[in-house]
Every structure is written in C-alpha cells, then in structure tokens.
From Swiss-Prot:
<dbReference type="InterPro" id="IPR048641">
    <property type="entry name" value="RlmN_N"/>
</dbReference>
<protein>
    <recommendedName>
        <fullName>Dual-specificity RNA methyltransferase RlmN</fullName>
        <ecNumber>2.1.1.192</ecNumber>
    </recommendedName>
</protein>
<keyword id="KW-0479">Metal-binding</keyword>
<dbReference type="InterPro" id="IPR027492">
    <property type="entry name" value="RNA_MTrfase_RlmN"/>
</dbReference>
<dbReference type="GO" id="GO:0019843">
    <property type="term" value="F:rRNA binding"/>
</dbReference>
<comment type="similarity">
    <text>Belongs to the radical SAM superfamily. RlmN family.</text>
</comment>
<keyword id="KW-0949">S-adenosyl-L-methionine</keyword>
<keyword id="KW-0411">Iron-sulfur</keyword>
<dbReference type="Pfam" id="PF21016">
    <property type="entry name" value="RlmN_N"/>
</dbReference>
<keyword id="KW-0489">Methyltransferase</keyword>
<dbReference type="InterPro" id="IPR040072">
    <property type="entry name" value="Methyltransferase_A"/>
</dbReference>
<dbReference type="GO" id="GO:0030488">
    <property type="term" value="P:tRNA methylation"/>
</dbReference>
<keyword id="KW-0698">rRNA processing</keyword>
<feature type="binding site">
    <location>
        <begin position="227"/>
        <end position="229"/>
    </location>
    <ligand>
        <name>S-adenosyl-L-methionine</name>
    </ligand>
</feature>
<feature type="binding site">
    <location>
        <position position="126"/>
    </location>
    <ligand>
        <name>[4Fe-4S] cluster</name>
    </ligand>
</feature>
<dbReference type="InterPro" id="IPR004383">
    <property type="entry name" value="rRNA_lsu_MTrfase_RlmN/Cfr"/>
</dbReference>
<feature type="binding site">
    <location>
        <position position="122"/>
    </location>
    <ligand>
        <name>[4Fe-4S] cluster</name>
    </ligand>
</feature>
Amino acid sequence: MKELVNILDFLPEELGEKIKPMFRVKQIYQWIYQKYANNFSDMSSLPKDLRLELAQNFHFSPVKCVKNEQSKDGSIKYLFELVDGLRIESVLLPMKEEKIDAEGKRISHARYTICVSSQVGCKSGCSFCLTAKGGLKRNLSAGEIVGQILWIKKQNNIPYERRINIVYMGMGEPLDNLKNVSKAVKILAQNEGLAISPRRQTISTSGLAKQIKELGQMNLGVLLAISLHAVNDELRTELMPINKAYNIAAIMDAVREFPIDQRKRVMFEYLLIDGINDKLEHAKELVKLLNGIKAKVNLILFNPHEGGLYKRPSLENAIKFQDLLSNKGVTCTIRESKGLDISAACGQLKERAKEQ
C-alpha cells in the first residue's frame, strides 16, 4: 500500500511543484486551514479528479487526539498520538481580553494562546523539567507542529481569522529542530492558511547561542524567549546541563544580535525555585545581566511534578523579587501558571505512555 504524505508539511510553493495550476493550491490551503475540511472529498470547489489524486497521495491528519483534560481555569491539555505511535502534549490557554469601545463601554472577548511541542521528548536535560526525564525520541516535522494547532482550532470552533498566539514552549527544544520549526512558522503565516503573523509566534530556547544567531539571520519576525533560570554559570549548569555548551555570556551575545521589532522585547523566562535561585541577590545580578538589553522578564513559580527535586517558592518572595527588578527599570511580570491542576503548566509536559 502506498504511503501517504502529510500535506501539512508543504508550503504553497512546494505544493505548487506537484499540483497545477497554482490557484488550485490556494484553494486547497483555504479548504484545509480556513474551512476546516475533514477530508479531500469535502473540497467541493476542486475538480473530482484532483480530489481523487489528492486522496491517493496525501493525508492531513498527522496527529490524533487520544485524551484531553480541562483545568478549572479553562486551560485544556491535549495528548496527541503521531502516525508512528509516539505521543506529544499541547495546551490551549484561553484568556479574557478587555477593551474600551468607541462609546466608552468595557467589552471582553476570548483570546487564545496555543502552546505546541516541537520534539517528542527533549535532550536538554533540565533538572526541573518533566519532559527531559524521558530523553529525546525524535524531531517533529513542520506538519506535525502545524497539525497540533489546526486540530485544536477545529476542535474548539475557533474561526481561522481569530487572532491567536503561538508559543513554542511545549515538549522539546525548538532550536534543536530549527529547520522544521522555522518552516512551521512560515506555513502558519500564509494568508491563504491560518494567517498567524510571525509577530504572534514566540520561539523559546534553553539558550542554543549558535541557533539563536541562525534564527536571527532568517529574519522571520518571530519573538524570542530565553529560558534563563539562573544568573551565574555554576548554578545554571547545575539546573541546565546545556549551559556547558553555551554559557550565559554566549547566550547574551547572541541575544544582542537578534533582530527584534522596536515595539517588542526579548522575553527572559526565570523559574523561581525555593532556596535555589529566588534570593534578592539573584535579582540584583539579573538586573546587571540584562543591562543594555530590551528585555521583559517572566517570573514563573516552580510547578511541582512527579519525581521533582525542588519546591515552589512563596508568592511573597516572588513579589519581592519582582519589585526589585521593577524598581531597577526591568519590565517584569509574575506569570500565572495556567493548567497546574492537570499537569499542563511549564515543565510538566511529557510523552505519556499508551496506558491511557
């Protein structure tokens, strides 16, 4: 039996090499990403012989949802099974956004962020992260990354034109899979598709300095987030072994070269761990480290998980840490850990075995 190819792996120009004329490719894109077609036979504006040809050569179901859990805060965690049987997790984070209309009335509407995985597992080995416990199985293809977003939008009846944010902060190190992640960014940005601007896509990294520079040279227009979590190399190496390859100085040099929109900032994720990196002396060092960088710091309180070595700090200590940064002119927020009760928060995702 002929093996079908995942059509979500293709940019329009690549699909155009296989399907003529080009306007048919645009129609296919619209059916998949905007009309949420379930199969090729649904694509009624295409000639019957083309629909048959597509069905004989392609599929667009690279992920299958085998389980989902909803948090009391509205977050939904999805367990997806890939074609080869491996599993990944993704999270939908709904939030309310309030605006003032022309008449001065306060109106609110739903705003969505989707946290996607870029690998099955991860090889970075961060001591505080559950994903790292199982090691790296393989990279996801661009279509498998896109497939997570498409499935979640379809399942939740989110119109294709509704603006959403994408964060590459699920399982895996995105820059360890830069080729496929960058391609996913381009596919998601297509006007005939989901039309998710790169400015609404944030790529997070544990600090692969070489790949940060490569990403910057691509000029994709994406936002960058650095998982920092420590202010000196000794502690960071203890928490994040990747620091042996790319130390803090190398990371900061790469960040300074990274092209960023004038209205945006490089995001620095800082996981506060009780008694480890949450002292005020650490906050003072962080201020020095970020000097001269257009930065925003996201403070995250450690999220407990099975077999975890660390403890969650008190909110009081986190606020003191935040206040010191803010008073020194560093833009800083304490990030709400959504999905904590369903193990969907930062550091809690993993490849769930098939016992479910």
